[in-house]
Amino acid sequence: SLMVIAPAHHRRIQAGILSWGQDMDQQHNPFQCNLGYQVSLSGKGEWNKTADYVGKAALEKMKEELKAGKKPYKLQLVGMELGGKPIDNYAPDFWLVSPESGGDPVGFLTSPWWHPEKKTNIAMGYVPFDGTLNANGFPKGKVGTKYKVHLPEQYSETPGTPVDAVVVDIPFKESFNANTREVVK
């Protein structure tokens, strides 16, 4: 018998729904993977959660460092639109991201896929955190920052040549009914 078990991969990525083990794991903190609004902590974006919870002291310290303009971690999850041939299969490994000018990799893609409505590849991935915060003080990627992505040959326009990529907001497309994450971004 056939039954639906999950959203289509491009819809998951489009909505910014994270996959445990692919987009985040126990080595990531909530701020790093765009879940800071969950820490805030009614989930509405304010910084006044009074209840105690595991890791509260570390997250409160990180919150203060972010507010002070410090960078308590190196990589931030971002959305990207990128070139190349349509990505139509799951990435068996992370694909490297380099600065626009080239050079050594500085990050990696976690979830790439072809977006049929946008007619381009979209992806979530980690790039250097530059300290950009949204209006509510939560970390985010700097929209418009350009990178190069090293795709496997099957998706590369020219084998061995990285494709252009640009940081965009997550979710990639606004929801019909905005959720808390979209409201506080």
At which residue positions do the language-model features occur?
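Conserved, structured C-terminal
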Residues: 1-185
